[in-house]
Amino acid sequence: MKFLDEAKVYIRSGDGGNGCVAFRREKFIEYGGPNGGNGGRGGDVIIETVDGLNTLIDYRYQQHFKAQKGGHGMGSDRHGAGGDDIVLKVPVGTQVFDEDRETLLHDFTRLGERFVIAKGGNGGFGNAHFKSSTNRAPRHANPGQPGEERWIWLRMKLIADAGLVGLPNAGKSTFLSVVSAAKPKIADYPFTTLHPQLGVVRSDGREFVLADIPGLIEGAHEGTGLGDRFLGHVERCRVLLHLVDATCEHAGKAYKIVRNELAAYEHDLTDKVEIVALNKIDAVTPEQLKEQKARLKRAAKQTPMLVSGVTGEGVPEVLRALTDVISEAPVSTKAKGEPTENETPPPSTGWSPLSN
């Protein structure tokens, strides 16, 4: 399945049905009175999170979504039928923005969450609604109210417990394939990973979701390489696993390049808990490993863990460190205050990517 994490769509809720002007006409009933029914309400446009989706690719092929109009009122006090709602299905972690791409309308963090993005128009009153003691034969009815229409942006941010970051070719995809059942593309050249990958990791009887993010290079925040657009997928992570290639020229400089790009992203990624690991230790000599470890320790201001995705050396220790941090770190939640009238209230406990 192709990966798409951003899409622009047009939505329109249904118009309300018109009210009806009608009078009761029966034999032997001279003054039957008004009996025009009301129009039906237009359908809503609803966005819902469903299981089994991790891309917005469906919205590349269809960008226009319109709910059904309400039925018109009829005589004999028959009201128009309400229009059918239309439901847009999105993955958990999707954010809805206004057309300006800056105004956040809703942030989906739970499975089965529903949000009414456009309400259908109300149906118009038929003339039976206007009858009174002073107006026994009203000859007017209301038209239905128009529905709402707008362009919106859907932006998906994967929800994972831990995120893999590092320079291209640092061994992130190999590490993910070793610790989970994920099968990312692996090759000996930079930018093998072109879009984020998710894997479920099991360690010491516990499970967590690990996200592999495409590699960052110097100047990524300015659009160099693949840019930093994929960093949004680690905003919700509770911990970052920073892999540094032991075979690179200078492990300390490689570490600082990625940290500078995380800081330039301006979404507090540098404030997240970080575990630093020196990868590919099987490909260097003991002397080189000692030198690279010292460089990385000075740059990261912490003792890096040593790991090899090829031989598996150090992998259990890294996973154990990740699970310990994940169990203690708080779940990232949206800071939007109380739920609006268009959304369902959140559960009392934090959401996890592995919860049902």
From Swiss-Prot:
Top-rank taxon, per record: Bacteria
Binding site for GTP: 166-173, 191-195, 212-215, 279-282, 308-310
Record-listed E.C. numbers: 3.6.5.-
Cofactor: Mg(2+)
Keywords: Cytoplasm, GTP-binding, Hydrolase, Magnesium, Metal-binding, Nucleotide-binding
Enzyme class: hydrolase
Pfam families hit by this protein: GTP1_OBG, MMR_HSR1
Localization per Swiss-Prot or TrEMBL: Cytoplasm
Keyword Iron appears in the UniProt entry: no
Quaternary structure and interacting proteins, as annotated: Monomer.
Entry's family note: Belongs to the TRAFAC class OBG-HflX-like GTPase superfamily. OBG GTPase family.
Official protein name in the record: GTPase Obg
Organism: Afipia carboxidovorans (strain ATCC 49405 / DSM 1227 / KCTC 32145 / OM5)
